[in-house]
Amino acid sequence: TQQADLTSRMGVKLRDLLLQALAKTPVFQAAAQPKQMSRLLVSRTEAGGGYGLHVDNAFMPVRDGQMRTDLSFTLFLSAPETYDGGELVIEHSGQTISAKPGAGDLILYPSTSLHQVQTVTAGTRLVCVGWIESQIPRADDREALFDLTNLKAELAKDHDPQSPIMLTLSKTLANLKRRFN
């Protein structure tokens, strides 16, 4: 497995492009509630490469010290038909989930989960990985806020933003974020 140099001129452009894409993705923002993110890694794995079963570090270095890793993500940059093997396998809540999604798809999962990358048997697997410290430390609180955010988006299709139901839901979401933080 090889890592791209994201400090080079071209690497900085790639890093900034990836960070902008994540910042503009409402589902990612609602699910992760990012407080801060680790440095991104762009990883290329060729035939014979993989990454064994492991759990991510509880803390990662950031500019001003360390951050807690609540969530991990893998953003797939290669189309699945361009390589064989290379599935991301996550063990979470007694289940094993294996995924090899399309280019541009992102898998967000608890950093506390055991996971691995199956051996790539042909072609090249290209991904971006990163870690998030959430504004909402507890997973169950993040899930409740995510559900309410989705409910708000659904209700917004049929209700004026200034309607009592939408204002109450907006107030409730904001107050829960304050409480959970």
For each feature predicted by the language model, list its residue ranges.
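Catalytic core of non-heme Fe(II) oxygenases with the double-stranded beta-helix
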Residues: 27-38, 43-141, 145-146
